[in-house]
Structure formats: structure tokens, C-alpha cells
Amino acid sequence: MENSKWGGFLKKAMSNVETSIDKVLDGNQIEEMSRGNAKSKDEIIAKLLTEGQALSKNELKLNNTIKQLKKSLSEAETKLKRLDEKQATPELQVSDSKEMEEQLELQKSQFEKRISILEKEKEDLQRKMEELTVESMEVVRLTRQVETLSTQYSIQRSQWVREDEKKKKEIQDLKELYEKSEHGAKNWERERETFQNQVSQMSKQLDSLEKLCERKDEEIRSSQAFNMTLREENDTLAAQNLDLQTQLDRLQRELDTNIRSNVKSKPKKIVTTGGIPENNDYTVGKVDTLKVTKEDEDPTTPTNAIPIPSSMSKRDEALENDKDNYFDDLHPLNISTSPQPSPLSFSEIPQSDTRNALENFLDNLPSPSEERSRISRSASEARKLGINAQSRYASISSAVLSPPSEASRKFSLYESEAISPTSGTPSNLEKGAGNVPDVSLLEQLATTIRRLEAELQTTKQQVAQLIIQRDQARQEIVDAYVNNDANEDSKKQVEELRLQLQNLEKEHASTLVTLKQKSDKVFELELDIKDMRELYVSQIDILAGRQ
């Protein structure tokens, strides 16, 4: 009974072990432990195998001894039965029975001793069986641990598979990103080269623009200096114009006062002969005799006047006509704003009062060699400039300095023929000509000022455009440097991604190596488990066959 009990317990333990092993084998669950844990488990399994073999041997020996004892016990029982049968025989066999009893007592004592020894051995076997049960419990614990480890392994395997797939996907993404980054790096290199070329071109343009700006600045400075000189000259000319204007106003006022006084006093007509006086006032006296009208018939004329010859009268009439034409030419020029009578329009003027005024007026007249077109052109351009002083001077100079007509030139030729070398006033003429500024110089100065101002304006516009282009070029250079920095950062990122890819490839290779090692270890464990199962099955079969 006890042997059958222990056999059932061992069968149950072996069935539990087999079920755990079947779970491990069928589920392809491979424990993933460190090398130290695997080595300790291998040692425990080997120790259990050796102990199981020793226990199986001891169990076989004990079974054999039990069988022998049972056989001997059955023989002893048969002998006792025989003795009991012999006791029922007659008393003749008493002596033989006594001997047999003594032998049986002796055998009984031997059997009792043997039974005590067997009981001791049985107790030892029970202790050993208890130890085996403890070891079987250890085996059960180990099987449970194997199950937990197998579940952990399955979980870790699934996690590892997911991580492996994730790493493969990351590697694929990194490869794609690396390819894209390589393509982007090539594009960035091309863009960088183009940006560098643009920067070099812009730098060259900037240098040329700076040189052009320097040249324009020099031209502007030179034009400003020339403009300052022109302004100084213009100021001096304006001062001269003011002086001339004051002189002209003073002369006009004197002439007006003289004319008004002469008109009120009604002076007598003065007629001279064709002779030339010896003093320097001949010119004025001659001009006074030119205006001969029908006032000769006036009863106020003195009777002792010298008659004029016919040749002289014809000559005087021609001169009078030329003189009228000359003053008609002067009339539209508007010498002053107030209407004034011509100084030679009166028939009778006192010689003593108007001599100085006429001399000054004639001294201020220009020479016949000056061109009328030059003076009129300078006056019109001066009026276009809008400068008050220049326009005022132009109006005065066009009135005073306008060239004479053909009649006036004839009159001047007549005067040159009639005047003696000693009767003229060259000092006054030279003085009047020196006070009048050159209008052609004013015209040149005005045109030069306008041209320089236009050039200054265009130069300022060009400088502003050049500054804008310079700022744009600087901004493009800054953008190019920023793009270059971005390209450098992207290159660094590509290098980092390349290093990460290499590290991941190394980790993948190492994981593949460890996976191969683990798979080999699992294959070895599967073989060991199969051997253990076969061994346990053989032991169970042996125990079952002996029972």
C-alpha cells in the first residue's frame, strides 16, 4: 500500500513536470535568463538527475529486499501452519515438535531481528521519501518558476519583437532621412555655391558702387566748390547791379527834375553854327541844336539868332530823324516803371542845366560792337531763373545796354566825325563801360549753376539708388550667411543621424548575435528537457512494472 501511495505521488509530480515541459515546448516559450541563472539551473537539474538515479537505485534495492522479506515471511507462515498441523498429531511426535519449536523460536528471533532491521531501513526509506517529497516540491517550485520565466520570456520576446520592428522601422526611416538629407545637402551645396557666387558678385558690385559713390562725392564737392565761387561772383554782380540801379535811379530823378524845371521855365531855343566849340561840352551843345522844329516862327525867338546854312539844316534833319528812330528803338524797353519823356524830345533845353545829365547818359551807353541777341538772351534767361537781383539787372541792362539801331550807328559815326580829339570824354566812357558787368558771363554762370544743380540732383538720386542697392546687397549677403549657417546645422544633423544609424546598426547586429546565441541555448534546453522527460517516463515505467 505504501509503495502504491508513493508511486501515485511520483506519477502526479511527473505529470505536473511533463505538463509544464509540454507548455514550454508547445508554446515555444524559451526562458531568457542571464548566464549565471542558466548555469545554476543546469547544475540543479543535473543534481536532481543524479539524486533521482540514486534514489531509483535505492528504491529498486529496497523493493528487492521487501520482496525477499515477503517471500521469507510467506515461507515462515507456511512453516507455522505446518507446525500447527503437526501439533495435532499424536504425542509420539512431541520430541520432534519440541525440536521444531526450538528451531522455529530461533528462526522467529532471527526474523524479529531481521524485521527490526527492515523497520529501521523502512524508516530510513521513509525519511528519504520525505526528502524526495521535499525535493519533488522543489521540482514543483522550479517548474512553476520555469512557467513564470517562460511567461516573462514570452512577454520579453514580444516586447523585443516589437522593439526590433520599431528599430527596423527607425532604421528604415533614418535611411530615408539620410537619403533625403544627402539629397538636401547636395541641393544646399549647390545653393551655397550660387549664394557664394551671388555674394562675390554683390561684393564686386558693392565695391564698384562705393567707388562710384566716392567719385560722385568728389564731383559733388568740386561742383559745390565751383557753385560757391559762382555764388560769390553772383553776389558781387548783384552788388554791382544794385550800384547801377541806384545810379540810374538817381540820374532819372535828376533828369525828371531838370525836365520839369525846364518845362515850367520855358527856355529859349539855342541855335549854334556848325562850328565846334573849344570846350569839352561840345557834344551836349550839338545834341541840343539837333531838335530844330517850327518854333523858329515863334514870336518869342530872338531876332539876333544866326541863320543855319541849308547844308547844315539838311544834315541836321537827317540826324534828327535818325535820333528819333534811335529813341523809338529805346522806347519799348521800359527803362523805368513811370512814363518818362526822352531827354532829346524837347525842342528847347537850357544848355547849362542838362549838360551833365546828357553826358552821363551818353557815357553809360554801350559801344556799337556789342550784340543785341546776347543781351536779350541773357535777360530772358535771367528772368527764367526767378532771381530778383538778376532779373532786375537784366531789365535795366536790356534797357540801357541794348545795341543801337542803324540810325544810331550813323549818329555815332557823325559824332565821331564832328568831334575833335580834344572835345571827347574818354575817361567818362571808360568809367561807364567798366561799371557795366559782362552779361555773357552772367549767362554762362546762370547756365552753369542750372546745369550743376541738375547734376547735383541727379547725383543725389543716383547716390540714393546706390545706397538702396548697397542695403539690398548687404541684406542678401546676410541672408546668404544665414542660409549658410542653416546648411551647416543641417549638415551637423545629418552627421548625427549618420552616427545614430551606425549605432543602431551595431545594436541590431549585436541583438541578432545574442538572439542566435539564445536560440542555440533554447534548442539545447529543449533537448535536455526531452531527455529528462524520457528519463522520467522510463523511471515511471520501471516503477509501474515492478509494482
Swiss-Prot record:
**What InterPro entries has UniProt attached to this entry?**
Growth_transcription_reg, TMF_DNA-bd, TMF_TATA-bd
Q: Where in the sequence is the signal peptide annotated?
A: none
User: Where found, per UniProt?
Assistant: Cytoplasm; Golgi apparatus
The processes (GO biological process) annotated in the record are: intra-Golgi vesicle-mediated transport
Q: Which UniProt keywords apply?
A: Coiled coil, Cytoplasm, Golgi apparatus
Q: Which residues cross the membrane?
A: none
Which stretches are annotated as coiled coil? 53-264, 439-535
Q: Which GO terms describe its cellular component?
A: cytoplasm; cytosol; Golgi apparatus
Under the heading Pfam families, the entry gives: TMF_DNA_bd (PF12329), TMF_TATA_bd (PF12325)
By sequence similarity, the record places it as follows: Belongs to the SGM1 family.
The protein's name? Protein sgm1
Provenance organism:
Schizosaccharomyces pombe (strain 972 / ATCC 24843) (Fission yeast)
